[in-house]
């Protein structure tokens, strides 16, 4: 169940951080919000600047490091009782996208032009340790300790360092599209999301990656509560959810306002917390899994054109008989229900533009395949 937390936010919230005791930090635009009671009450912290917070890193019991669109680093060591800021790189030249401090003194920032910055004095000064200058972007970064880390780029590959950024190894993923987010739930196991809807997984600290789900749209924020259970958000408020370490996935609508997107999601004290483009914050519990996606069955389930205008073709294996085609809108309403044939042409000219879910089920309601598509006119 997705429950909206009443915060008074009216602007985009890009990042969520969690202290070890479960206290929440939600940042975006020029205001930071802080809650010590699971989102029931909030304290607003003005950053006194004109730049948006893009990403943050929580370290220890009291410290937070935040990067902004103006190439500034904001730092607190006492839970926002005091704040300091420092310059990183060159504003307007290399944008900052992700930050990770494995310890209080050592931190890394990933950014545009495939650049990585490093600080060894708690964020006061920064050195450029990787700059490929190819026009691409490093979208996310994660360090296991002060020396061993990984960053993801806009061409579907990773860079790994074992010596604090002195040298880097290029690691390819199964994809060629931007890798939006990476999260490691143990020292070895991690997941990554892509702008083309795929999800990939590693079991060896990012040295090798395998595709575990080919979805649609763009998968974004990754968050796992433990090795078995986790979220990966998708376009237009939809999300994927697994309870078996990514072997199977559910696909459902989150309940955010139509057209809004979930930008970040974090787990704390038994709940997931999600931040949205319109400033809404959701607290998530008692998850219901309506359908399960089996990737091997999806291989024979195709829908085109995508985006659609007036009709869609739905194709699946000819030996699939006695099936139904269900199409749902982004609010979860069933808008089309009909018998499935191996090659269906379905009229959608009476449906408005937007994101839709198409599933193939038997007469008992068991889902055998599912995909998404958009209608655009």
Q: What label would you give each PLM region?
A:
Residues 35-36, 76-77, 119-120, 161-162, ...:
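Conserved Ser/Thr-centered positions that define the repeating blades of beta-propeller domains
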Residues 18-21, 58-61, 101-104, 143-146, ...:
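Residue-level detector of Asp-centered blade-edge/turn motifs that repeat once per structural unit
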Residues 1-9, 40-48, 81-91, 124-133, ...:
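Trp- and S/T/G-rich repeat-edge/linker motifs of beta-rich repeat architectures
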Residues 12-16, 52-57, 94-100, 137-142, ...:
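Repeated scaffold domains used in trafficking and secretory/extracellular systems
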Residues 22-26, 62-66, 105-109, 147-151, ...:
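Entry beta-strands of beta-propeller and related beta-repeat scaffolds
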Residues 261-289:
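Blade-level signature of beta-propeller repeat domains, shared across WD40, Kelch, NHL, RCC1
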Residues 296-304, 308-377:
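C-terminal outer-membrane/trafficking sorting elements
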Residues 30-32, 70-73, 113-116, 155-157, ...:
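Loop/turn residues immediately N-terminal
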């Amino acid at each position: 169940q997705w429950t909206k937390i009443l915060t008074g936010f009216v602007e985009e919230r890009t990042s969520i951080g969690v202290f070890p005791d479960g206290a929440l930090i939600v940042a975006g635009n020029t205001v930071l919000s802080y809650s010590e009671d699971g989102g029931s009450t909030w304290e607003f912290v003005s950053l006194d600047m004109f730049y948006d917070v893009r990403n943050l890193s929580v370290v220890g019991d009291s410290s937070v490091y935040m990067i902004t669109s103006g190439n500034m680093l904001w730092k607190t060591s006492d839970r926002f009782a005091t704040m300091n800021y420092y310059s990183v790189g060159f504003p307007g030249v290399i944008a900052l996208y992700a930050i990770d401090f494995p310890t209080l003194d050592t931190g890394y920032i990933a950014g545009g032009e495939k650049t990585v910055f490093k600080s060894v004095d708690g964020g006061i000064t920064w050195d450029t340790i990787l700059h490929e200058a190819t026009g691409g972007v490093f979208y996310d970064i994660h360090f296991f300790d002060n020396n061993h880390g990984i960053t993801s780029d806009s061409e579907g590959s990773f860079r790994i360092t074992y010596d604090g950024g002195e040298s880097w190894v290029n690691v390819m993923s199964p994809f060629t599209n931007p890798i939006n987010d990476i999260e490691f739930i143990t020292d070895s196991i991690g997941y990554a999301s892509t702008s083309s809807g795929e999800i990939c997984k590693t079991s060896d600290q990012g040295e090798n990656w395998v595709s575990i789900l080919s979805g649609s749209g763009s998968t974004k924020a990754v968050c796992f509560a433990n090795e078995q259970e986790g979220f990966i958000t998708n376009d237009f408020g939809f999300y994927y959810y697994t309870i078996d370490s990514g072997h199977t996935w559910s696909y459902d609508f989150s309940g955010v306002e139509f057209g809004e997107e979930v930008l970040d999601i974090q787990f704390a004290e038994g709940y997931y917390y999600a931040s949205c483009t319109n400033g809404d914050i959701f607290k998530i519990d008692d998850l219901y899994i309506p359908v399960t996606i089996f990737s091997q069955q999806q291989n024979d389930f195709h829908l085109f054109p995508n985006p659609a205008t007036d009709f869609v073709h739905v194709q699946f294996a000819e030996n699939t008989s006695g099936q139904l085609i269900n199409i749902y809108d982004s609010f979860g309403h069933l808008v089309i229900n009909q018998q499935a044939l191996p090659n269906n042409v379905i009229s959608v000219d009476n449906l408005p533009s937007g994101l839709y879910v198409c599933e193939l089920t038997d007469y008992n309601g068991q889902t055998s395949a599912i995909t998404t598509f958009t209608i655009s006119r």
